[in-house]
Amino acid sequence: ESFIKDQDPILKFDSCGNFMDLNIDERYHHSLEVDSENRIYVPIYNSTDNIDRSLYSEAFYDDGFSILDSNLKNLAKFSLLNIYKNNGYFGDIHSEHNPGTDPFHLNDVQPFKTSDDRDIVLLSIRNNSRILAFDITKNNALWSIDRAVSQQHDIDIFPDKNNEKI
């Protein structure tokens, strides 16, 4: 349980371990990744404030991710429920069966730049056993890898031998 009721903050410390700042805007969880511009990518719980409770139980929560600057200020926020709705994946969590309370369980948000300089994230969505490539500028899914592994967690990108971008 968090030391701040109903919050899972992200904390910032200096290299000596001295507390510098915190952000309690969201319920942050699992990993965090930093891109080449020092933006922080971190999964969040309940990323949609306006979940239609006629479709989802009170226990249902939507995962998503936030992008923060190096001072922990929120730059952008994305909802997996909205990403799934807007990109043809909605049926994967909302078919004739109840989607349950945790249809996504986002474990990792791995940022990278493509060879044409687009900002992409790879999302590790445990409960769908899916890795989803998402263009954060165009707000659209590019591709997914489904069930290649079961309930994966961390995504790491290794440069090829020529250190080329994907």
Predicted regions: what is each one?
Residues 1-6, 44-61, 96, 114, ...:
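Short, conserved, GDST-rich strand-edge loop motifs in beta-rich repeat architectures
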Residues 101-166:
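Beta-propeller domains
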Residues 13-17, 68-72, 135-139:
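Short loop/turn segments that connect beta-strands within beta-propeller blades
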Residues 27-29, 47-50, 61, 92-112, ...:
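Signature of short aromatic-glycine-proline-rich micro-motifs recurring in repeat-based ectodomains
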Residues 1-34:
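Blade-loop segments of beta-propeller domains
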